[in-house]
């Protein structure tokens, strides 16, 4: 991959955008970091300055009142600054942990607000995975921008403080009686000396820039290795994985996979780079810092020896020069971190900036008391992004509110695609879908979605209370939740739970949570759809974990309680078909049969009759 050349302007622009993005997450963080950086950077200089005043007085007039004044000032000022620094340091660490967790809200909001068609793309999921990988394995991304800000302030304020305390070092004159050491007064010598120090530090900055470039190259090439390691290290935490691992001895497979993944081993790419180009450049950069400090020490000692200043000033300049060298080193290293982080911030914002291209209408869906809605598909066709095959082709049909509609067909026949189009998770490339005669794209998206309750086959429950799972909110009507659970067949299980609706699902947060079976989870998901009380209820194979008889019982019960709602059933198993008003049979993206259960059975050679006869033993006495 060809690397993009970036300027200092590019790096700073990305850093500033990251700060603007993180600041609303917790507005207290950056002010606290700024105050703490000020205290951290200037405390050494204040200590050095006050100590130097005491030494100057001790080596000079030794006046007790002056010594007491400086001693008391030193204790009070340094003590107060140290106390404040400790306070703000604790605040900074607490806020840093807080902002680390809260910044995930940015990604959650983006995930649920972007077009579903984009969210469903593999490249979008890979992009999000790459962002998480960068943060979890190398610490780069949004949070590193906060660290860079903190370190940059420490370095910059340290340099400013150091320059302020060492300016006298360069302005003080060596006496003319100092012989050859009077060269230290020469403007030419001072310019050459400054140029050498600047050159050494620019060289160190270039070294850190090269280290950042190498790290970015390693990071790009380590994507697969990162994912392998992440998969293996999180494997034990996945529910049910160790059962299969024990039975089928999968440990050896995982061990071999980990052994062959040399990304982070001593002999791998990172290990070789640490011992080679990165290690060498890091050592040279550290060495340059030591050389800078040594030159300043030598210059200071020669001036003091020549009589340019007293022992107190010598202490001040040596201490300030040491702190200044450390601050310069911090600033240069931070610039390297800034360079390294830019590419990862670009990845982050590429995800956060994904545009929503789905047309957003302005019409509201009628809140009809009679729930009199009708839906029509007109010559609808869809290809999924990146596919050349039609998932749905030239589909036309109508259905009225209050009807029972079954959609059947084999895997890949287009059943779920039909539902995704109905719910406007995708827009068709051809044709149109109408609600009460109006193209659904003209309705407000949230309003339109509000008329559907859906239970998908791959539904998810969250590790929260049972009541919150059903209601989708922490505030809910307990009686309605209980009724929905009872209607879904979960009533007996609910009665056995000591905490009732407050029972925590799963044990992610503690041992007081409960594990629910696949069948129980599906009943909770169905109860969630019932609680929403939308005019359309769609069941997309949600009963796959139930046996055929239990499924038939659930569907029969669901048919009773759905009332005047439109119910759409999708299932491999056909227990729902007997009481449906109409059945659509899909095959290879098209509707090949349409009619009632009895009418379709009369077509003995038809697809529906074949599917029904293969399963009839489960539904007939």
Residue ranges of model-derived segments:
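ABC-fold ATPase nucleotide-binding domain signature/coupling loops
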Residues: 434, 491-524, 533, 618-621
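Primarily ABC-family ATPase nucleotide-binding module
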Residues: 247, 251, 352-403, 483, ...
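Membrane-integrated ABC transporters
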Residues: 1-43, 65-69, 88-92, 124-160, ...
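Cytosolic ends of transmembrane helices, especially the final helix of ABC transmembrane type-1 domains
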Residues: 250, 296, 315-354
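Extended non-transmembrane interhelical loops and adjacent amphipathic helices
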Residues: 1-16, 97-143, 224-272, 342-355, ...
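Transmembrane helix-loop-helix hairpins at lipid-water interfaces of multipass membrane proteins
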Residues: 31-84, 159-212, 302, 307-311, ...
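C-terminal portion of ABC ATPase nucleotide-binding domains
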Residues: 499-500, 556, 563, 573-621
